[in-house]
Amino acid sequence: MEDDGYNYYGADNQSECDYADWKPSGALIPAIYMLVFLLGTTGNGLVLWTVFRTSREKRRSADIFIASLAVADLTFVVTLPLWATYTYREFDWPFGTFSCKLSSYLIFVNMYASVFCLTGLSFDRYLAIVRPVANARLRLRVSGAVATAVLWVLAALLAVPVMVFRSTDASENGTKIQCYMDYSMVATSNSEWAWEVGLGVSSTAVGFVVPFTIMLTCYFFIAQTIAGHFRKERIEGLRKRRRLLSIIVVLVVTFALCWMPYHLVKTLYMLGSLLHWPCDFDIFLMNVFPYCTCISYVNSCLNPFLYAFFDPRFRQACTSMLCCDQSGCKGTPHSSSAEKSASYSSGHSQGPGPNMGKGGEQMHEKSIPYSQETLVD
């Protein structure tokens, strides 16, 4: 699978299977990449616009995670035209070695930064709802800035192996230039699989399994707290309760649906070097992997639309800003943006992971009714 432009940690499991007929769609996949590029640049650009148009006094701690997530997605989607071209040319890379290294590196920086930001937002929402008073200091704006900086540094460091090992070389028949992971500088041909499996499995653990476990834990306690609140308070019955809890479920499930197929198929294929899958199963994994990758990439353009769909306040803020610009008004709809910041964070957990961020410095956020305002009309 060395000529596969999707598995950025390599995937040559040295199997004896015949992959001669393997060929992902040269039309569908590039089209999806370009669609994600167009929607992702527009949507994430709008997210950044709405966040930074809000006055500094009105911003909440979650806003820095939201903006950071949009930056990560935006940084990634701008590389998609390169990968669309690579796929359309049947894995012939015309852009040189440096662009191969850099674009691959940005993909992994995005993956790590996105899931770390989503985890940070989930933890921020946990603090806002479950432990609002005792942990109020952790949700100050400055703490969010420091945490975000640390997350970006960690993401950049974790992606370094891609920058180091990614390279270009002629294919076996010499007709194409491939952009692939080359471990020859540190391993023999017989031990390269160990590097591939080690880096691939570790990226799945750090970039999916551990963050997803943390997010599930946060949402479990959030759901418990909300359910307990509804038992104690007289609220409008089960309809609002159902809606509030269903939004939380959507945040976690969407993250899993976008990224689990990619990580699962990648890990299974790489483990084929150790477990020796039957050829039919091995070829099946290779065939579905490009499409699993497409699903995970869609996450980078999906988050803004999920905000708009699930959060009327964010939708209203965007509409107000657009209308305001068209009419030439000078004011910034602070109230809409501020409301967006709170509810927005809940919707963002779609992507590479659920990001729930509420954040905010106000001590009165301790009450669950605040969360209800945030997530429910």
Swiss-Prot record:
Q: Which keywords label this protein?
A: Angiogenesis, Cell membrane, Developmental protein, Disulfide bond, G-protein coupled receptor, Gastrulation, Glycoprotein, Membrane, Receptor, Transducer, Transmembrane, Transmembrane helix
An example GO CC term for this entry is: plasma membrane
**Disulfide bond annotation, renumbered to this chain:** C17-C279, C100-C179
The terms under GO molecular function for this entry are:
apelin receptor activity; mechanoreceptor activity
Q: What happens when the gene is disrupted?
A: Mice lacking APLNR are not represented at Mendelian ratios. Mutant embryos exhibit incomplete penetrance of embryonic lethality. Mutant embryos display improper establishment of the fetal-maternal circulation, such as underdeveloped yolk sac vasculature, embryonic vascular malformations and impaired cardiac tube looping at 10.5 dpc. Mice heart of embryos show reduced coronary vessel growth at 13.5 dpc. The heart of mutant adult mice induced by pressure overload display no improvement in cardiac dysfunction, hypertrophy and fibrosis in response to peptide hormone APELA treatment.
Q: What are the recorded Gene Ontology BP terms?
A: adenylate cyclase-inhibiting G protein-coupled receptor signaling pathway; adult heart development; angiogenesis; aorta development; apelin receptor signaling pathway; atrioventricular valve development; coronary vasculature development; endocardial cushion formation
Provide the residues annotated with a glycan attachment (glycosylation).
N13, N173
Q: Where is the composition biased (Low complexity)?
A: 335-349
Q: In which tissues is it expressed?
A: Expressed in coronary endothelial cells (at protein level). Expressed in the embryo, allantoic and endothelial precursor cells of the yolk sac at 8 days post-coitum (dpc). Expressed in the secondary heart field and somite at 8.25 dpc. Expressed in fetal allantoic endothelial cells at 9 dpc. Expressed in the allantoid and the invading fetal vasculature of the placenta at 9.5 dpc. Expressed in endothelial cells adjacent to syncytiotrophoblast cells at 10.5 dpc. Expressed weakly in the embryonic heart at 11.5 dpc. Expressed in the adult heart.
Sorted alphabetically, which Pfam families does this protein's record hold?
7tm_1
Listed SUPFAM superfamilies: Family A G protein-coupled receptor-like (SSF81321)
**Membrane side Cytoplasmic: residue ranges:** 53-62, 124-144, 222-244, 311-377
Q: Which residues cross the membrane?
A: 29-52, 63-84, 98-123, 145-162, 197-221, 245-268, 288-310
Which ranges of this chain reside in the Extracellular compartment per its record? 1-28, 85-97, 163-196, 269-287
How does this protein sit in the membrane?
Multi-pass membrane protein
- Induction, per UniProt: Up-regulated following myocardial infarction (MI) (at protein level).
In this chain, the stretch annotated as Disordered covers: 334-377
**Where does the record place it?**
Cell membrane
Provide the function of this protein: G protein-coupled receptor for peptide hormones apelin (APLN) and apelin receptor early endogenous ligand (APELA), that plays a role in the regulation of normal cardiovascular function and fluid homeostasis. When acting as apelin receptor, activates both G(i) protein pathway that inhibits adenylate cyclase activity, and the beta-arrestin pathway leading to internalization of the receptor. APLNR/APJ receptor is also activated by mechanical strech in a G-protein-independent fashion to induce beta-arrestin signaling leading to cardiac hypertrophy.
Quote the subunit structure annotation. Answer: Homodimer; dimerization inhibits APLNR-mediated G protein and beta-arrestin signaling pathways compared to monomeric APLNR.
Q: What does UniProt say about this protein's domains? A: The hydrogen bond between Asn-44 and Asp-73 is crucial for beta-arrestin signaling induced by APLN/apelin-13.
Record family assignment: Belongs to the G-protein coupled receptor 1 family.
Q: What is this protein called?
A: Apelin receptor
Instruction: Say which species the protein is native to.
Output: Mus musculus
> Gene for this protein?
Aplnr
